């Protein structure tokens, strides 16, 4: 595999549903992240040869070409092509893979990958409005809930988590303990300032003033007793609750990548290189187990072992599926999501893959680690995995 390197990246803080970023469009979030990534990397906008952004839920017509608008607003010229990718939960990770592929093929020397999502701005649509209804009620559809439902009829993604819990013997107690660990680790990371260098602030309106939003706001102070007292959401006698599931969130991230030879020629020092990537498909009704075959495919392609990774960011769509993935891959829980995951920090669906890649890079450097693994389950029954190594 041609050496593809990561020069630098940045993410916004993650906003909670209806929270600080609810008034900010995904294009603006993507623009903020892209500008910061370019500035940190030392790459000029004119050097970027290809842009790919993950994005799932269009909130306005311009979002249909979010990547193009964000890129140009960030200072990338109109001669540089851009595209959106939608691999649902894996969109931000797929954006990275797509840029890697473009660079490997020699289509560009430098690329920008990222993701942007503002789930708070998800629209309602009226499908019958264009051609009219002859009589009767007209129903509106919530596009956010639509994105969170299985396209094959299983129902909400939470039902797929219940299925995974049943198939892999994941108890309610284990899920709540996992959720508590996520909250505890995230709170410790924020208090210790571990995310500060990753985050670029977003200016948001607060009353009459514009203030910087620069701290993840989704984590909640809780206890095991409080988590244990929550009712199951998706099945009457189920185990998946609002407390052991990921959030509905807003945020963005961007990463500048390059061919190693192009970076060296430009006198730029990369922070990491991409070791490989892989995808997999699984039964849609147990979509949460997707990272297991995806990571297995990655290991087979690269010759790596699961024990080679010092930091593993395994997206916490639900505690049930995250635990099943840990179990299926034999992961060391101490290395998985050391600074908390999506249960605590949130899951801005199209951006999360890029966000957790940045988290992995910064944490590897903080602890002096070498290799990192990023993996995610994907609604509809898929998994994606990326391996990186610090330089």
Language-model segment annotations:
Residues 1-24, 36, 224-289, 293, ...:
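Condensing-enzyme catalytic core mediating Claisen C-C bond formation in acyl metabolism
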Residues 1-56, 60-70, 74, 81, ...:
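Conserved active-site "lid/cap" helical segment
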Residues 11-12, 23-32, 174-261, 265, ...:
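N-terminal extracellular/periplasmic Venus flytrap/periplasmic-binding protein-like
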Residues 24, 55-110, 151-157, 221-247, ...:
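Conserved catalytic cysteine-centered active-site region
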Residues 87-117, 165-194, 254-261, 326, ...:
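Active-site-proximal alpha-helical scaffold in enzymes
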Residues 109-163:
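Flexible glycine-/small-residue-enriched beta->alpha junction loops
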Residues 160-162, 195-198, 205-206, 275-344:
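Active-site pocket-lining segment
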């Amino acid at each position: 595999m041609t050496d593809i390197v990561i020069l630098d990246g940045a993410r916004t803080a993650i906003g909670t549903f209806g929270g600080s970023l609810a008034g900010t469009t995904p294009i603006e979030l993507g623009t903020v992240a892209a500008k910061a990534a370019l500035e940190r990397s030392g790459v000029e906008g004119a050097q970027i040869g290809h842009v790919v952004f993950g994005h799932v839920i269009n909130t306005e017509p311009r979002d249909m070409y979010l990547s193009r608008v964000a890129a140009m607003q960030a200072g990338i010229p109109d001669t540089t092509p851009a595209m959106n990718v939608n691999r649902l939960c894996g969109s931000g990770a797929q954006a990275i893979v797509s840029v890697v592929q473009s660079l490997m093929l020699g289509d560009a020397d430098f690329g920008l990958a990222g993701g942007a999502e503002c789930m708070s701005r998800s629209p309602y649509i009226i499908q019958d409005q264009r051609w009219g209804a002859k009589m009767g009620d007209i129903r509106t559809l919530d596009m956010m809930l639509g994105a969170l439902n299985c396209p094959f009829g299983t129902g909400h993604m939470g039902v797929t988590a219940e299925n995974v819990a049943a198939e892999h013997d994941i108890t309610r107690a284990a899920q709540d303990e996992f959720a508590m660990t996520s909250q505890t680790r995230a709170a410790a990371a924020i208090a210790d300032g571990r995310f500060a260098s990753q985050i670029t602030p977003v200016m948001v309106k607060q009353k009459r003033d514009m203030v910087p939003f620069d701290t993840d706001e989704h984590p909640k102070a809780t206890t095991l007793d409080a988590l244990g007292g929550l009712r199951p959401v998706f099945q009457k006698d189920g185990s998946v609750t609002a407390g052991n599931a990921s959030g509905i969130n807003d945020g963005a991230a961007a990463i500048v990548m390059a061919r190693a030879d192009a970076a060296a020629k430009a006198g730029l020092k990369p922070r990491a290189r991409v070791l490989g990537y892989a995808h997999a498909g699984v039964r849609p009704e147990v979509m949460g187990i997707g990272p297991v075959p995806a990571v297995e495919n990655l290991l087979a392609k690269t010759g790596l072992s699961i024990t080679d990774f010092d930091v593993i960011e395994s997206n916490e769509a639900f505690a049930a599926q995250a635990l099943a993935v840990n179990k299926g891959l034999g992961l060391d829980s101490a290395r998985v999501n050391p600074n908390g995951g999506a249960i605590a920090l949130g899951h801005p669906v199209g951006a999360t893959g890029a966000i957790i890649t940045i988290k992995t890079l910064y944490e590897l450097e903080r602890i002096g680690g070498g290799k990192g693994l990023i993996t995610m389950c994907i609604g509809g029954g898929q998994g994606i995995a990326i391996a990186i190594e610090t330089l």
